[in-house]
């Protein structure tokens, strides 16, 4: 006799998030969305400021104005302070995000982590490959291979806010995890490939400072007046070591504890991230964009973006490489692990998110400055290519996401519906008997109201009476 068929138990990928994870993602992305809009405003301001002849000189003067203690090796230009100083705050938050993902988020479970990690890695490797092939074919410089590898989550969310599209929580979490892993490998790329000379004395001091930072955290020492001065010292030593100073930010972020203990509502990492994220998204990143995105744009310059191998490689890497890398790896990973896409989503949704990830701005601009540090003209051309590629990726994503917007709106409404008004969306209470008892009580009251109205209408019809007050499902002017 044939053995009974085993039911299909294929693992679902990109399914609905747990309620705590959904709440965390929503809170994190809400701040990033506001920051993304500010980033967009700062970018437009920089482009206008740098391209109006009457204002162009003032932009250059402000960007190259130097200040800071020369004796400590910190007499830097405003643009330099923004790139090395303010972005350390951005990478500090990125470090906390990564730590949280590793100990309490999607990356905690190796099976769940495979998909976003593979997608992020391929989403960096394929753009780098596209850039390299373009420049080998066109006899250009391969120094900028890392420029199109990054995803800017804030800019991507700003695009979503502008076009009025709400992604389901699973897609938002996927995009956030992609960006977090992207940031991690971008940091490694900066540390490994863009560190030329190392001052080992300063590096040793920075490492010692990080050790003190870690020890104070483990001892439970509290107080910003302890950690902020120490963080500034570590940053200054890291800067003078020759290693990019933003590495100090991510290192300190990774040291924070992101798990809760008994009696704690939030972990120290979550608490500090909640305090610092608005500073990062609302001030640090927009100011970096203001002094980094101000490239002179002309018809000839835009034409060069599509003719010079270095700039064309950046554009193709962001628009084509990112999309193919993320979508292709996600599809192949699901196929070879015998996983199935959540029934709420389609592969077209993954393709749309992959194209949205082609918006590589903040980190791409930073790597562009590092890769072509000795060539001001090429640096500006690469910045223009980053802006152009990100704009094309945003337009492609807008079209793809708008096609699916009605479906997304329905999924978001399902995730937020709370008919029993207990503060928890109904989709998270389907297995809770108390929820069904509350819903049964609601429906019984609605049914009783319907019966009352029907009976009064019938009585009114027999006696030729007036209209019956009230409405089905209403009690005292409120839904039953």
Swiss-Prot record:
Q: Which Pfam families is this protein grouped with? A: Na_H_antiport_1
User: Which membrane topology term applies here?
Assistant: Multi-pass membrane protein
Q: Which UniProt keywords apply?
A: Antiport, Cell membrane, Ion transport, Membrane, Sodium, Sodium transport, Transmembrane, Transmembrane helix, Transport
Its cellular-component GO annotations read: plasma membrane
User: Is Transcription set as a keyword in this record?
Assistant: no
Q: Where does this one sit in the cell?
A: Cell membrane
- Major location, coarse class? membrane
User: According to the UniProt record, where is the region Disordered?
Assistant: 454-480
Q: Which residues cross the membrane?
A: 34-54, 76-96, 113-133, 144-164, 174-194, 197-217, 223-243, 282-302, 312-332, 350-370, 381-401
Give the catalytic activity.
Na(+)(in) + 2 H(+)(out) = Na(+)(out) + 2 H(+)(in)
The record's GO molecular-function terms, alphabetically, read: sodium:proton antiporter activity
Kindly give the InterPro entries that the UniProt entry links to this protein. Na/H_antiporter_dom_sf (IPR023171), NhaA (IPR004670)
The GO annotation for biological process reads: regulation of pH
What's the family?
Answer: Belongs to the NhaA Na(+)/H(+) (TC 2.A.33) antiporter family.
Q: What is the annotated role of this protein in its UniProt record?
A: Na(+)/H(+) antiporter that extrudes sodium in exchange for external protons.
Q: What is the name of this protein?
A: Na(+)/H(+) antiporter NhaA
Q: Which organism is it from?
A: Streptomyces antibioticus
